[in-house]
């Protein structure tokens, strides 16, 4: 279900404050965040954000095509290591 258009997109307050401070100073540095539910807004374009995937922080460079998506979409939490082999010896 999508978010109502009457509401603004969700962005964590402390995370939004960090972005605004960097934009005022016109600096680019990596911002570490655990807020995977935050929506990418146009003020974030050009920043590198390290998004937590449950184990590490993955640095993601924000581009204009990412606006409107959630931060968590770009930091996968699961690593697929393949299906189990069909080992007939273990069945005996």
From Swiss-Prot:
The keyword DNA-binding does not apply. The keyword Transmembrane does not apply. It is found in: Plastid, Chloroplast. Keywords: Chloroplast, Plastid, Ribonucleoprotein, Ribosomal protein, RNA-binding, rRNA-binding. PROSITE patterns: RIBOSOMAL_S19 (PS00323). Its main location: plastid. One of its GO terms (molecular function) is structural constituent of ribosome. InterPro entries: Ribosomal_uS19, Ribosomal_uS19_bac-type, Ribosomal_uS19_CS, Ribosomal_uS19_SF. One of its GO terms (cellular component) is chloroplast. Pfam families: Ribosomal_S19. Signal peptide: none annotated. GO terms for biological process: ribosomal small subunit assembly; translation. Protein S19 forms a complex with S13 that binds strongly to the 16S ribosomal RNA. HAMAP family: Ribosomal_uS19. Belongs to the universal ribosomal protein uS19 family. PANTHER family: RIBOSOMAL PROTEIN S19P FAMILY MEMBER (PTHR11880), SMALL RIBOSOMAL SUBUNIT PROTEIN US19M (PTHR11880:SF8). This is Small ribosomal subunit protein uS19c. It comes from Liriodendron tulipifera. The lineage of its organism: Eukaryota, Viridiplantae, Streptophyta, Embryophyta, Tracheophyta.
């Amino acid at each position: 279900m999508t978010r109502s258009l009457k509401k603004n997109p969700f962005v964590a307050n402390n995370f939004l404050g960090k972005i605004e401070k960097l934009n005022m100073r016109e600096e680019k540095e990596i911002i570490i965040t655990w807020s995977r539910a935050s929506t990418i807004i146009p003020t974030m374009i050009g920043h590198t954000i390290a998004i937590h995937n449950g184990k590490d922080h993955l640095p993601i460079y924000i581009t204009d095509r990412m606006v409107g998506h959630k931060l968590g979409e770009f930091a996968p939490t699961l690593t697929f290591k393949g299906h189990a082999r069909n080992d007939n010896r273990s069945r005996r």
